Amino acid sequence: MIDVGLRIDVDTFRGTRDGVPRLLQTLDRHQIKASFFFSVGPDNMGRHLWRLLKPRFLLKMLRSNAASLYGLDILLAGTAWPGKSIGKQLGSLMRDTDSARHEVGLHAWDHHGWQANTGRWDEATLIHQTRLGVDALNQILRREVDCSAAAGWRADPLTTQAKEAFGFRYNSDCRGSGLFRPLLQDGRPGTPQIPVNLPTFDEVVGTEVTTAQFNAFMLDRLCTPPQVAPHVYTIHAEVEGIVMADQFDALLAEASARGIRFVPLGSLLPPDPAQLDAGRLVRGTLPGREGWLGCKADV
């Protein structure tokens, strides 16, 4: 069997309300445990509309047919009216996920806020924003959260430093291959990072493959040994939990037939994380994704 980390990002109110229950049913049917990362504060995702002025973001939205893929309620959330509080209204679904023995971690307090502003926030603001999310999710789950995954992979040396204050078991904040410990400002290795090395649906559909070709494309990637193990695959509750739910169900069935076993990210950690190699988490770019994002780099 080939173990592949399965990360599920839940960005929005609709993704939590509609996508998570269906994903829980699908994963239970296939006897799979995964890592869910929840946005718990206001759903302001519609405020990304201003980014349509940027050619790369506009192209991405057009080629992925975003209006039908995500729905107008997601694309307009938090624009003409205050964003709904995801955690306050839908916290029970986060508890359901935890009770089903999936790994549950923090994605963001305000997904839009993190993705749009991380690059200019100072360390105190980064800590405050993370604290808002951690406190809310702790209260929802009635236990302490021990892992996180940065919204939109917006992470750099400063966010890495800021997250050290929370004692997470691991973070999944960047793209790249192979687990590592990012170097902090004082040269010490920090909390383990579990990078994502496989592309997401919206990064390749419309440029490399069609929607109908996506499963075959992804299965080929999953079955190809990574340059540095392990494979880590990210899906979104707003996509694979709603519009592409049947296609994702089929992908899981075929993956199992090919000897692929999806596992929570935390199970990829070695018994002694201190033995992981050191690395750097830096800003970079990725085909199919607009703007900068965190990337693994060698020391």
Swiss-Prot record:
| Residue ranges of every copy of the NodB homology domain listed in the record | 2-263
| UniProt cross-references to SUPFAM superfamilies, sorted A to Z | Glycoside hydrolase/deacetylase
Lipid metabolism as UniProt keyword: yes
Report the GO terms under cellular component: membrane
KW Phosphoprotein (keyword) present = no
Domain of life according to the entry: Bacteria
Question: Which keywords does the record carry?
Answer: Antibiotic resistance, Hydrolase, Lipid A biosynthesis, Lipid biosynthesis, Lipid metabolism, Lipopolysaccharide biosynthesis
Which catalysed reactions does the entry list for this protein? 4-deoxy-4-formamido-alpha-L-arabinopyranosyl di-trans,octa-cis-undecaprenyl phosphate + H2O = 4-amino-4-deoxy-alpha-L-arabinopyranosyl di-trans,octa-cis-undecaprenyl phosphate + formate
InterPro entries (UniProt xref) = ArnD, Glyco_hydro/deAcase_b/a-brl, NODB_dom
The protein's annotated pathway: Glycolipid biosynthesis; 4-amino-4-deoxy-alpha-L-arabinose undecaprenyl phosphate biosynthesis; 4-amino-4-deoxy-alpha-L-arabinose undecaprenyl phosphate from UDP-4-deoxy-4-formamido-beta-L-arabinose and undecaprenyl phosphate: step 2/2; Bacterial outer membrane biogenesis; lipopolysaccharide biosynthesis
The protein's matches in HAMAP family, at most eight in alphabetical order, are given as:
ArnD (MF_01870)
Record function comment: Catalyzes the deformylation of 4-deoxy-4-formamido-L-arabinose-phosphoundecaprenol to 4-amino-4-deoxy-L-arabinose-phosphoundecaprenol. The modified arabinose is attached to lipid A and is required for resistance to polymyxin and cationic antimicrobial peptides.
Designated name of the protein: Probable 4-deoxy-4-formamido-L-arabinose-phosphoundecaprenol deformylase ArnD
